[in-house]
Design a protein with these regions (language model features):
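Regulatory and interdomain segments flanking nucleotide-handling catalytic cores
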Residues: 1-125
Length: 125
């Protein structure tokens, strides 16, 4: 049994290119930290402002999701105009629990019921 996290940075289009690059770098660093913290965790950024994660310990999924949300909510773009617009928003998150057919970092592939569930739930938010 696996847990997956699907997330979308809300209002990312209001960020400047430099601010979006900075946010992506912070998210990548956070995902690396989560990999060290939770055995069996793998996360990636897709489509520029979306996040997909899988972990083999569903009990830790909510905590990992809150860490990601906290990172995005605490992000302060250096551009004041970006900051005013962006601070109203954050991260939409959905967690799916289920089986996974494929988890392959080398192919950058996640496939299975859990990722479908979190993806569908996110699209309904």
């Amino acid at each position: 049994m696996y847990a997956t996290i699907s997330a979308d940075v809300v209002s990312s289009t209001s960020l400047s290119k430099d601010a979006m690059i900075e946010l992506n770098e912070r998210l990548k660093k956070c995902l690396s930290t989560l990999e060290l913290r939770y055995q069996g965790f793998w996360g990636r950024i897709v489509k520029g402002d979306s996040i997909e994660c899988v972990m083999d310990c569903p009990e830790d999924a909510f905590e990992a999701a809150l860490i990601l949300k906290t990172l995005v909510k605490s992000f302060e773009p250096s551009d004041v105009n970006d900051s005013k617009r962006f601070n109203r928003y954050g991260l939409r998150i959905a967690i799916g629990i289920g089986e996974m057919k494929t988890i392959d970092r080398n192919l950058d592939m996640m496939d299975g019921d859990a990722i479908y569930r979190s993806g569908r739930a996110l699209s309904k938010l």
